Amino acid sequence: MSRLTAEAISLSFEQRGQRRAILRDLSLGLAKGESLVVLGPSGCGKSTLLNILAGFQKPDQGRVQIDGRTLEGPGGERGVVFQDDALMPWLNALDNVALGLRIRGLGKAERTARARQVLQLVGLQEYAEQSVAQLSGGQRQRLGLARALAVEPDFLLLDEPFGALDALTRERMQVLLLDLWKQTGKGLFLITHSVDEALFLATDLVVMDGPPARIVKRLPVDFARRYAAGETVRSIKADPEFGRLRQALLDEFLDVAEAEHAH
């Protein structure tokens, strides 16, 4: 089974004449079929870690590998979805999805067929000819997911993809993401500062603090697998164990914040 790993990653940059550490000797990994969610406050290094996994930034030390092969930059085995959808506003939905396939050398008929296939997967088949400006925020994020899925990556890397959405749309997108995860068997790497989102979407949850980024806690979570097995969202979120873990994680963040304030 394909596995994506970050091994002893460190990164720092110059600030006012001094080196500032963002990541220090950080290691983690996930396999296809798993959903690794990194939960942490803004500014702790989550997005930097995702950018390194995606190949957009190079670490000062350490390496990113898939199945033992060191990665030197972006690649088709990793699809990326951002909070800012980064769509091409002058293209319609279908052409936004097909663009990445064109760059990879697919012929017009093949890329159009593939683009329509993934638009159907995310429920946007009726909006294929619509311009980006005509789409709602939730539809734009669906389109971002479709574009990432079109190149058939083994792993989806998602940088707070639902953070700008209203609460109801956000929950619908979480459910869609788990539906796609169940259907495709891809590995998910998602970063968020929402405790509820992390608990619902993760099979493995990493709590991060920083900078420099450090892993405070790792724990296995079974709510995503329970949803994939047919349990309802309402039943999962009404489970006392969901509430207990939610409160424990919130308490952990409060403890860290109070300790920092004391210093």
Swiss-Prot record:
- Its EC top class is translocase
Residues of the ABC transporter domain? 4-235
Q: Which cysteines are joined by disulfide bonds?
A: none
- InterPro entries per the UniProt record, alphabetical: AAA+_ATPase, ABC_transporter-like_ATP-bd, ABC_transporter-like_CS, ABC_transporter_ATP-bind, P-loop_NTPase
Q: Which GO terms describe its cellular component?
A: plasma membrane
For membrane topology, the record states: Peripheral membrane protein
Reaction equation(s) it catalyzes: taurine(out) + ATP + H2O = taurine(in) + ADP + phosphate + H(+)
What the entry lists under PROSITE patterns is as follows:
ABC_TRANSPORTER_1, ABC_TRANSPORTER_2, TAUB
EC id: 7.6.2.7
Q: Which compartment or compartments is the protein found in? A: Cell inner membrane
Residues holding ATP: 40-47
Write out the entry's keywords from A to Z: ATP-binding, Cell inner membrane, Cell membrane, Membrane, Nucleotide-binding, Translocase, Transport
Q: Name one GO molecular function term.
A: ABC-type taurine transporter transporter activity
Q: What does this protein do?
A: Part of the ABC transporter complex TauABC involved in taurine import. Responsible for energy coupling to the transport system.
Question: What binding partners and quaternary form does the record give?
Answer: The complex is composed of two ATP-binding proteins (TauB), two transmembrane proteins (TauC) and a solute-binding protein (TauA).
Protein family membership: Belongs to the ABC transporter superfamily. Taurine importer (TC 3.A.1.17.1) family.
The molecule here is called: Taurine import ATP-binding protein TauB
Which species does the entry assign this protein to?
A: Pseudomonas aeruginosa (strain ATCC 15692 / DSM 22644 / CIP 104116 / JCM 14847 / LMG 12228 / 1C / PRS 101 / PAO1)
